């Protein structure tokens, strides 16, 4: 895995309530593969992480604001889950627009657990094959997605996964997909 993403800039979009392991483990996999990761959020400072949505799990430092971010500055996007995190993102027009523009750019986008709620809000799931946490699958189907119950679903530039239990497979898939789709070339700047 080391070096596959050398020079790549990966945006991680998350808000308060992010599931800690769903941000931490994919970020570690991307960093180990040579990517540079930047945490974008709705406010500066730090975001509050959770374990299983209920327990305080510390904080993450925010690197930039999504309202000031440009898709052109990044090679790939990661959308971690947690229930509260995507619920906050999906009502913020700058976050929704950033996700929509990212998917439409053809650059790779990865999302896990409840993270696909933000993809749904961005209007980019119709006709796509995705997986997610079971409780949002009806929402995805109602938005026109084909939903599968698999560790990882890859459809073009979208990579989705179900839950923290699937993190090893998800981390492998995002590194492989980001590298295969050109994120490893580090073209953003």
Language-model features, listed with the residues they occupy:
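Catalytic, metal-anchored helix/loop core of enzyme active sites in primary metabolism
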Residues: 113
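Extended, subdomain-level signal for the structured scaffold at the beginning of enzyme domains
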Residues: 1-105, 109, 118-124, 129, ...
